[in-house]
């Protein structure tokens, strides 16, 4: 079961148990008890709505490997662990920027080598 389903099941069980308990008490107290439960559940429902919005919003773009003839731009290869021989651009770019910033320059990944400019 996924997390959202578990949360919903838990909340429903909680609500049912509270309603049963309130019914045994009977009378006006039952309505007050149910109103309190609903107030407690509202923030949780809001959080669940935010989570579903985040999941259904447009997907984040995947990182593409460096433009090189020996690399293919398939999503399968992007998802594979990066071998030490073939590093993806963002990793190399971060390393290049660190190396070149010591010299007061910017770095660029060019054919898997750092170029300072």
Curated annotation (Swiss-Prot):
Which keywords fit this entry according to its UniProt record? Answer: Disulfide bond, Secreted, Signal
The cellular component terms of Gene Ontology attached to this UniProt record, alphabetical and capped at eight, are: extracellular region
Where is the protein situated, by its record's location annotation? Secreted
Its tissue distribution reads: Expressed by the venom gland.
Where would one find the signal peptide in this protein?
Answer: 1-22
What does the record say about PTM?
Contains 4 disulfide bonds.
- Name assigned to this protein: Venom protein TxLP11
Q: What organism does the UniProt record list as the source?
A: Lychas mucronatus (Chinese swimming scorpion)
């Amino acid at each position: 079961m996924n997390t959202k389903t578990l949360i919903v099941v838990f909340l429903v069980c909680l609500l049912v148990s509270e309603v049963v308990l309130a019914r045994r008490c009977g009378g006006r107290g039952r309505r007050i008890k149910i109103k309190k439960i609903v107030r407690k559940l509202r923030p949780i429902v809001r959080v669940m709505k935010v989570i579903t919005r985040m999941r259904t919003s447009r997907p984040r773009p995947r990182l593409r490997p460096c433009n090189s003839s020996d690399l293919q731009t398939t999503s399968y290869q992007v998802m594979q662990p990066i071998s030490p021989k073939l590093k993806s651009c963002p990793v190399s770019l971060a390393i290049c920027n660190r190396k070149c910033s010591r010299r007061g320059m910017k770095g660029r990944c060019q054919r898997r080598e750092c170029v300072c400019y």
